[in-house]
Amino acid sequence: MWNYGVFVRGDVPEALGIDPTSIKTTEELLDFMQKAKDYGFKDVNGNDCIVATTFHNGWSYDNYLQSYNEKKLTGYSLDADGNVTYDKLSENYVNKNLVVWKMVHDGLLDKECFTTTDDAAKEKVGNGTALFTCAQYGVTIDATKQSGLYDSNPEMRYTWVGPLNYSDGSAQVQVESEGRSGSPA
């Protein structure tokens, strides 16, 4: 299991009185992020924080948008009429990415995250400048180990948000394929 998800610096939900595991939709997450932005948190060096970031080249911003996703293994769908559709050609895909634009526009998502290097991203997470991050939990932990953040500021340990539900409201789970799968080669 890769442990993809959204993570928040541990002192944030405590200061705001929010249980991060109660966040189940992207809309609830955005509300949580806005409250964190309004609070005015600082990093370990006393600098202003950015609300949310990703790792290199925007990896994995789509974790913030999980509640727009259907529970399935592929980007293709078979509609009621028997037509195959591709997610990136759907209205949902457009709406989902408009949320990303709104996050950047509202100052919730670091606009540099789409072109950043992994080292720069690790620095933002490692010194607690980013209040929220997403990708694999191990990557988040590694960034804080490199900086010593947890040793000097254990209250800033990143913790899980959610997990966010699928678009139909069902809980996010590890999706398993049915029947045969794999390569014939």
Specify the residue positions occupied by each region the protein language model found:
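Extracytoplasmic/secretory soluble proteins
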Residues: 1-185
